[in-house]
Design a protein with these regions (language model features):
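Sec-dependent bacterial lipoprotein signal peptides
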Residues: 1-17
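Extended, compositionally simple hydrophobic/Ser/Thr-rich segments
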Residues: 41-53, 99-102, 107-238
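Short acidic/polar N-terminal linker immediately downstream of export determinants
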Residues: 17-70, 81-83, 87-103, 120-121
Length: 238
């Protein structure tokens, strides 16, 4: 019985090894290709491409990259969520940057990185309430003007935000950091359950809970402070 089991395992391994994906290598000139999509209020990145959030007509996205790569980029809208990923039938070797420019407006409610790609903005974006999630190794770097912002890091990627908001929530459960020392907020709630660090600019009220090894650095001299520390991390005031 043991021999039969080992034989089956060996056959499965051989089958798995024989199913390696063909590689698509970026070739040719860098071209721009436009696509028209239905409206969306959320953006989710699930691959190694980069996304740039811009002002403009929602749904009119532009793909910039090697001319042979564009057909493999999947952009689909499901229940208001724009998902960006690569075709799963191939492996990819990016010789040039693959960038997708995605217009957004105040209706944007959520941005998620689940992969190695980054999400950035070259302009300040105006939103009402926005949640940003890092679940992989990619980073989020945005300039925002908002009423309420919420950030979650459960991977190794970092989040860097500048701008203004009324209320801010930050939850770290991974090794990634949150850099918000250029994001001015009146009220902030920060929680660390991992090793990532948090930097905040708070002017009125701060609530912080540290149960991991990450540190919280505060500037702005908030009037009300409630800090609970049960891990090895600490709070520093600038």
């Amino acid at each position: 019985m043991k021999k039969i089991t080992l034989l089956c395992v060996g056959l499965l391994l051989l089958i798995g090894c024989g199913r390696s994906l063909p590689v698509v290598k970026g070739e040719g000139q860098v071209l721009s290709k436009e696509r028209k999509l239905p409206a969306y209020t959320q953006v989710r990145l699930e691959c190694g491409a980069d996304i740039v959030l811009t002002h403009g007509q929602v749904g009119d996205i532009t793909i910039n990259g090697s001319q042979n790569m564009e057909p493999y980029v999947i952009t689909e809208v499901k229940n208001g969520v724009l998902i960006v990923r690569m075709s799963p039938d191939f492996a990819y070797q990016f010789t040039k940057k693959l960038e997708i420019c995605i217009p957004v407006d105040e209706s944007l409610t959520e941005v998620t990185v689940q992969g190695s790609g980054d999400i950035t903005s070259h302009q300040q974006l105006q939103v009402k309430e926005l949640t940003c999630n890092v679940l992989g190794s990619g980073d989020i770097d945005l300039s925002l003007q908002a009423e309420s912002l919420s950030f979650s890091v459960k991977g190794s990627g970092d989040i860097k935000i500048k701008g203004t908001t009324q209320t801010l929530g930050v939850a770290i459960a991974g090794s990634g950091d949150f850099d918000g020392d250029a994001l001015q907020t009146k009220q902030a709630n920060a929680s660390i359950r991992g090793s990532g660090d948090v930097e905040l600019f708070v002017t009125e009220q701060l609530s912080a809970d540290i149960r991991g090894s990450g540190d919280i650095t505060i500037k702005g001299n908030p009037k009300k402070i409630d800090v609970q520390t049960k891990g090895s991390g600490r709070v520093r005031y600038l």
